[in-house]
């Protein structure tokens, strides 16, 4: 069984994330979505809220075949990959700036475990501008986030900023 790990903070989960998840499902038998506990980022949503958000929004994708498991983690990404039995880490790229950061991460991860590959999926052109940080800013200022997140995620965002 080919297991892939798609890690992220998912604060909030965006349509860009969902696009990568859907496309990643075609590459692996089981996709583990690693919801990172990143205290440096100071997430808007709690870990529990983010896990529920990912589980809820991925039900329809999983119903089309394949297995999705949501797994919170706080350790090194490469250790998380080992813990869940992943042979590949899947990452989405929106722009050159993403690549520069990810390139460094691949080098470090490869030094820690050369047996785990990293595969990059380019963001769909319609989703390249979507960034969780910007979506939160739009929501905070009362803007319409419906082009960037699902209705349920949008409602959760608006509730946070009321």
UniProtKB/Swiss-Prot annotation:
Keyword field contains Disulfide bond: no
Any GO CC annotation of this UniProt entry: cytoplasm
GO biological process annotation, one example: coenzyme A biosynthetic process
Subcellular location: Cytoplasm
Reactions listed under catalytic activity: (R)-4'-phosphopantetheine + ATP + H(+) = 3'-dephospho-CoA + diphosphate
Gene Ontology MF annotations: ATP binding; pantetheine-phosphate adenylyltransferase activity
InterPro entries: Cyt_trans-like, PPAT, Rossmann-like_a/b/a_fold
Pathway(s) this gene product operates in, as recorded in its UniProt entry: Cofactor biosynthesis; coenzyme A biosynthesis; CoA from (R)-pantothenate: step 4/5
Site description Transition state stabilizer, residues in chain: 17
Primary location group: cytoplasm
Key words, A-Z: ATP-binding, Coenzyme A biosynthesis, Cytoplasm, Magnesium, Nucleotide-binding, Nucleotidyltransferase, Transferase
Binding site for substrate: 9, 41, 77, 91
EC number: 2.7.7.3
Positions annotated to bind ATP: 9-10, 17, 92-94, 102, 127-133
Family annotation (PANTHER family): PHOSPHOPANTETHEINE ADENYLYLTRANSFERASE
Function in brief: Reversibly transfers an adenylyl group from ATP to 4'-phosphopantetheine, yielding dephospho-CoA (dPCoA) and pyrophosphate.
Complex formation: Homohexamer.
Family note: Belongs to the bacterial CoaD family.
Name by which UniProt lists this protein: Phosphopantetheine adenylyltransferase
Organism field: Cereibacter sphaeroides (strain ATCC 17025 / ATH 2.4.3)
């Amino acid at each position: 069984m080919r297991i892939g790990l798609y890690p992220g903070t998912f604060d909030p989960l965006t349509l860009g994330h969902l696009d990568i998840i859907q496309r990643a499902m075609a590459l692996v038998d089981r996709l583990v979505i690693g919801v990172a506990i990143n205290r440096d980022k100071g997430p808007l949503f709690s870990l529990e809220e983010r896990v529920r958000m990912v589980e809820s929004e991925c039900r329809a994708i999983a119903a089309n075949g394949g297995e999705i498991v949501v797994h919170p983690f706080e350790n090194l990404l490469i250790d998380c990959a080992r813990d869940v039995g992943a042979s590949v880490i899947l990452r989405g790229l929106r722009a050159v700036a993403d690549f520069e950061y990810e390139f460094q991460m691949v080098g470090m991860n490869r030094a820690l475990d050369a047996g785990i590959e990293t595969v990059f999926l380019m963001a769909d052109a319609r989703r390249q501008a979507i960034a969780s940080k910007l979506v939160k800013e739009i929501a905070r200022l009362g803007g319409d986030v419906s082009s960037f997140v699902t209705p349920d995620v949008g409602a959760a965002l608006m509730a946070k900023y009321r």
